Amino acid sequence: MDKIIILAGGYSNEREISLITAASVTKELKKNKKYKLLTIEPDGDFVKKLRKFKPKLVLNLLHGRYGEDGYIQSILESEKVKYTHSGVLSSSLAIDKEISKKIFIKNKILTPPYFKFILKKI
């Protein structure tokens, strides 16, 4: 029986969407009794739980910071665990919209004009 960790929740403002997605994915995967599932959050015990469960795959359903910025990906790669999502470098670049735009422009990928908006502390 293959073990799969469903990584959901997290700290972004899209936390609830991540949890709803995790519930839906869990429901569907349970229909196929080939998998042993564990749903966890990226808390302080994440690596400990990961090592104990020894999954074949981590379904990364996190949004925003930690889930889409290369952070979780770097942990999973250091633990030699397969995961869904882009890799460390592509995630860390894509989360930065200005860098992404510059890469698109340099590679002649059509993209709408942009401007950088900086909030100054009052």
Locate each region found by the language model.
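Basic phosphate/pyrophosphate-binding loop/patch that engages nucleotide-derived ligands
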Residues: I103-T111
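ATP-binding N-terminal substructure of ATP-dependent carboxylate-amine bond-forming enzymes
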Residues: M1-I99, K106, I118-I122
